[in-house]
Curated annotation (Swiss-Prot):
CDD domains: AdSS. GTP binds at residues 12-18, 40-42, 302, 408-410. Homodimer. Mg(2+) binds at residues 13, 40. It is found in: Cytoplasm. This is Adenylosuccinate synthetase.
Length: 423
């Protein structure tokens, strides 16, 4: 068996949570391979809305095993709140959720450091979510991190050493803070975590594959936020691309099967950073309103713009995408004209590839297509798609070189239409 990978192709918020929920019936295991509680997956299940930050989206399927992999960073306090809310709503998870011993813990002082570093940058700040993600990955790479497995071995000594080191840094930054409440909630989270299965997830995932079980790897955020290939330095601190599934779960590259790439029919970005197709007019405001574009974790208003095919082609290439999934098609239902960025103009020269740096001086070059002016939310199959919408799909497939296998026409899992079903 091979593992399939599901990931975002833009700047995050593409709708991965819903798609994982739609795909999970086909899989035995769902595993998160990177990121932390800085990104939320929003799902609507049986009329109720859920936001998952650290827990895999397969948790709503009663017979699935869910794994938090070694590439994830975990905040015990936020995990406890998320898990308790799920259990209170009728979704037990203690027997179905396994946590890698090698996953790194977000400490209370990591969150304080996050705020202190951002404050020190002034106008040059990246716009982090303040959840301590960057400082946690920094400790991981510098070999100073505290891992889930450490909860069972010399925990107090390892936590105390990390805390003391962080306090020295905060002192040098002259940053005032109060750790009392954060640390109290965090320690309660540590005790709660002990109720779950701590596993060597690399062995577990590979044993499932050896036994013929199907595994879906779930990414967080999006390709354009990848630490190496995203719009640096306005990126996250982990590898959000397909290769991250290998390092974040312990899966060999030759075990990767299908790669599902998710994108919106338009573009959004939350926080600071370059965004070539961003709209600052009423069209952008309309997208934001119709798409309910507010961050699921931070509540921040998302910046909106037309689809960027230069960046999207780059993402398809980097990830080796085999199937595309287009989300939020219905948000564009009322637009007379749909625009798509097909090239950039940089220093007066038109280019059709993603350059080293897009932080400034990038002007989008657009193709225009007629809008479909049809309510897509009630549609049940691709046979009902209007001609203009089919033309948009064909245009995108020709530009990207990959079939759009699934189209989402609303937030509910039922509002999901599969294409090319005759194959």
């Amino acid at each position: 068996m091979k593992v399939d990978v599901l990931l975002g192709l833009q700047w995050g918020d593409e709708g991965k949570g819903k798609v994982v929920d739609v795909l999970t019936p086909k899989y035995d295991v769902v595993a998160r391979f990177q990121g932390g509680p800085n990104a939320g997956h929003t799902l609507e299940f049986e009329g109720q809305k859920y936001v998952l930050r650290s827990i895999p989206s397969g948790i709503f399927q009663g017979d699935k095993v869910n794994i938090i992999g070694n590439g994830v960073v975990l905040d015990p306090a936020l995990f406890k709140a998320e898990a308790e809310a799920l259990e209170a709503s009728g979704h037990p998870l203690k027997e179905r959720l396994h946590i890698s011993k090698k996953a790194h813990l977000i400490l209370p002082t990591h969150r304080i450091l996050d705020a202190a570093y951002e404050a020190a940058k002034g106008d040059a700040k990246v716009g982090t979510t303040g959840k301590g993600i960057g400082p946690t990955y920094t400790d991981k790479v510098s070999r100073n991190g505290v891992r889930v497995g450490d909860i069972l071995h010399n925990f107090e000594q390892k936590y105390g050493a990390a805390k003391a080191r962080h306090e020295q840094i905060l002192k040098s930054l002259n940053y005032e803070y109060d750790l009392t409440e954060l640390e109290k909630a965090w320690m309660e989270g540590i005790e709660y975590l002990k109720q779950f299965h701590f596993v060597d997830s690399e062995h577990e995932v590979n044993n499932y594959l050896k036994d013929g079980k199907s595994v879906l790897c779930e990414g967080a955020q999006g390709t354009m936020l990848d630490i190496d290939f995203g719009s640096y330095p306005f990126v996250t601190s982990s590898n959000t691309v397909c290769a991250g599934a290998c390092t974040g779960l312990g899966v060999a590259p030759n075990r990767i099967g299908e790669v599902f790439g998710i994108f919106k029919a338009y573009c959004t970005r939350v926080g600071a950073g370059p965004f070539p197709t961003e709209l600052f007019d009423e069209t952008g405001d309309k997208m934001c309103t119709l798409g309910h574009e507010f961050g699921s974790v931070t509540g921040r208003k998302r910046r909106c713009g037309w689809i960027d095919l230069v960046a999207l082609k780059y993402s398809v290439m980097i990830n080796g995408v085999t199937k595309l999934i287009m989300m939020k098609s219905d948000v564009l239902d009322t637009f007379d004209t749909i625009k798509a960025c097909v090239a950039y103009k940089v220093d007066g020269e038109e280019i059709d590839y993603f350059p080293y740096d897009i932080t400034e001086g990038v002007e989008p070059v657009y193709a225009e297509l007629p809008g479909w002016k049809t309510d897509m939310t009630k549609m049940q199959s691709e046979d009902e798609f209007p001609e203009e919408f089919n033309a948009y799909l064909t245009f995108l497939e020709e530009q990207l070189g990959v079939e759009i296998k699934i189209v989402s026409v609303g937030p509910d899992r039922a509002q999901t239409i599969e294409r090319y079903t005759e194959e």
